[in-house]
Amino acid sequence: MQQLNPSEISEIIKGRIDNLDVSSQARNEGTVVSVSDGIVRIHGLADVMYGEMIEFPGGVYGMALNLEQDSVGAVVLGAYDTLAEGMSAKCTGRILEVPVGKELLGRVVDALGNPIDGKGPLGNTETDAVEKVAPGVIWRKSVDQPVQTGYKSVDAMIPVGRGQRELIIGDRQIGKTAMAIDAIINQKDSGIFCVYVAVGQKRSTVANIVRKLEENGALANTIVVVASASESAALQFLAPYAGCTMGEFFRDRGEDALIVYDDLSKQAVAYRQISLLLRRPPGREAYPGDVFYLHSRLLERASRVSEEYVEKFTNGAVTGKTGSLTALPIIETQAGDVSAFVPTNVISITDGQIFLESAMFNSGIRPAVNAGVSVSRVGGAAQTKIIKKLSGGIRTALAQYRELAAFAQFASDLDEATRKQLEHGQRVTELMKQKQYAPMSIADMALSLYAAERGFLTDVEIAKIGSFEQALIAYFNRDHAELMAKINVKGDFNDEIDAGIKAGIEKFKATQTW
């Protein structure tokens, strides 16, 4: 056996020290303590931030939501079946970001911005944070430009302005999604970009919506964000924020955008599930204490921003333009109960609500808008001039009709004035009916409202109101195309337009059939 003298031993040690690779990487790493139901508990992450992305082996990511004294609770974004106790978990120092930009228009993406429509990668897109602070009061501008939904009942009585938050609320299966989709279809030539966020819906339902948007030429102008019912609660919770970030891209660059959240009830349920699994204390209806903040921080991001904000954001690249993000959140009620926890929260956050009623829907009045309890708190200032002028008596007529109709059931004989009011109300109710996927232009709508407001429907049978309206619009678009184009472009109402519409309707009634 070879003997080593002390000098050789010291030389070997020196050589090893000289050749030692001492380059080290400082990182914050912990150990997975438990994995269950999409929730991971991690021990040993010292400097983790709230909402920070956490990396697990195999390219799986999570999001830190509970920062406790000796552990961190995180939700896994995606499949968690590969994770096991004892695995390492690393902090990334980043918060969740999603792709943004015009490359997303016409595409269907998941809650993390990955394309799921089979049309290939998105291309060169920027990314932006999912959680952002809403613009401050100083940077905002008042709402004074309209978003035309194409629905007579909405644009006449409950107008929506650019930068407004207008809630669509009602029971299941009474046309909430149909109304929102029609509003998106009506924007295809308006220059407003659209984002449709589907939360907790069946994939077949979403596929049908995408097909309808494509058939009506509106998909090229729309981003569809999907967190279906089969996906994790974490993705259903994040999808509205991801969609909002994609919409803010347009707002911050001086463009106008419209976002539909379908629906926030399912997002609240997903957040409740996450919170209960994270062992947070439950409150009313088992929702966590911050469920109001869940929706308020999302809906406050919908706003109209000033020219100065856009100029500052784009570093002077865009000047003299305001930007807006208009939100149409949808809430599903149970048996018409708007006093439940989530509906009351969202009603108090938004700038008005469109209330859809089951009884009206079942009696064939579609869209089933209850004009009495629906309201738009800021949209009046944004309403098109001609629609504002002609719609004044419509809401009153409907409100009086509903009141008198209930009274008339018990009264045997009615005086002449009451009978006329009832008949006028019936005709206006019939006129407010509208087919799905058939949004109306400003001129078409003005024509219908003019006929109702100026008494041209008095001698038309109630059963024939719909066919009268269709024939009238077709006649004007054929024989008075110049007048219709003028109304559509300017939206003004003056003596010349008044006289033109009046003469046209009189001639139509004298010469045409319906």
Swiss-Prot record:
What is the predominant subcellular site recorded for this chain?
Answer: membrane
Subcellular localization is given as: Cell inner membrane
Residues annotated for ATP binding in this entry: G170, D171, R172, Q173, I174, G175, K176, T177
> Which Gene3D superfamilies is this protein grouped with?
2.40.30.20, ATP synthase alpha/beta chain, C-terminal domain, P-loop containing nucleotide triphosphate hydrolases
Q: Give membrane topology per the record.
A: Peripheral membrane protein
PROSITE patterns with a match to the protein in the record? ATPASE_ALPHA_BETA
**Its biological function?**
Produces ATP from ADP in the presence of a proton gradient across the membrane. The alpha chain is a regulatory subunit.
What NCBIfam families does UniProt report for this protein, alphabetically? Answer: atpA, PRK13343.1
The annotated subunit structure for this chain is: F-type ATPases have 2 components, CF(1) - the catalytic core - and CF(0) - the membrane proton channel. CF(1) has five subunits: alpha(3), beta(3), gamma(1), delta(1), epsilon(1). CF(0) has three main subunits: a(1), b(2) and c(9-12). The alpha and beta chains form an alternating ring which encloses part of the gamma chain. CF(1) is attached to CF(0) by a central stalk formed by the gamma and epsilon chains, while a peripheral stalk is formed by the delta and b chains.
Q: What is this protein called?
A: ATP synthase subunit alpha
Q: What gene is it encoded by? A: atpA
